[in-house]
Amino acid sequence: MTISVPATSANLGPGFDSLGLAVDLRNVVEFHPSKFFSVSIKGEGENNPKLKGNNLFISIFNEHYNRLTKKKQNFKFNFYNQIPMSRGLGSSSAVIVSAIASAHEAAGIKVSKRRILNHALVYESHPDNITPAVMGGFNAATVEKNKVFSQKKHLPDYIKAVVVIPNKQMSTAKARTLLPKSYSKESAVYNLSHTALSVAAFFNEDWEILKIASQDRFHQKARMKTLPELFNVQKVAYESGALMSTLSGSGSTFFSMVYDEDSEMIASKLALKFPEFAVKILNFDNDGLIIDK
């Protein structure tokens, strides 16, 4: 059995803990019953020996498999990871979602994407990453009574993502400590209005307004100060024609949305200006979680 989950970019602009989208950079896990437990990793994390034992995936998988079957069974897991770890591209959400889906498949129990999403909420209390990881596309999401409520927009082929990935990790927990403890009414209204406009822009495919709509006063500046070069990344992206340019998740990756015809030019300018960072052009992913038996 094979499970794959895409990378995600969340906290989009003013959409703190509420807006996210999926990009075509995937973590894949293949698994089957085995006499002995074993883990192999290729790609991201392959040189980290701690991940080859009782990692987050294995812990969540075992929890759900044992709950569903009431029995013990060893499995061989082969991981093929493309999503950089702790870079603001949803690596943790990919692990959580793939573990839950894998456990249900291993137990022979069909489960809806919505059910998997709500299970994932136990491990990731904010829906902006886990929702696009499961559903794909652009998502506006909220949590009410321990359930995720969301709306998805399919993203067209004529827009692309350009991501700038610094060689610096940023944990979500640490990034949250950088945020203000309170916000003014003015800032709250600013972000509410810009979030509403951002959602409307995505659903109406009115991309040109995103440069205004994606402005934020809640989280980006406080987090970007830990890596000041990101302010210049955003400046160069906008000067080169990006439709929106925003911190991805809690960082350190910076995400820009661009027209397909501009993607090579914008990526080249960013790579030339910031040679110490990785720059990738990515398609958007509209599938989310994929299960192949």
Swiss-Prot record:
Catalytic activity, EC: 2.7.1.39
Pfam family, one: GHMP_kinases_N
One annotated Gene Ontology cellular component of this protein: cytoplasm
Catalysed reactions listed for this entry: L-homoserine + ATP = O-phospho-L-homoserine + ADP + H(+)
Residue stretches in coiled coil: none
Assigned keywords, A-Z: Amino-acid biosynthesis, ATP-binding, Cytoplasm, Kinase, Nucleotide-binding, Threonine biosynthesis, Transferase
Family named by the database record: Belongs to the GHMP kinase family. Homoserine kinase subfamily.
Role of this protein: Catalyzes the ATP-dependent phosphorylation of L-homoserine to L-homoserine phosphate.
Name this protein carries in UniProt: Homoserine kinase
Organism: Sulfurimonas denitrificans (strain ATCC 33889 / DSM 1251)
Gene it is expressed from: thrB
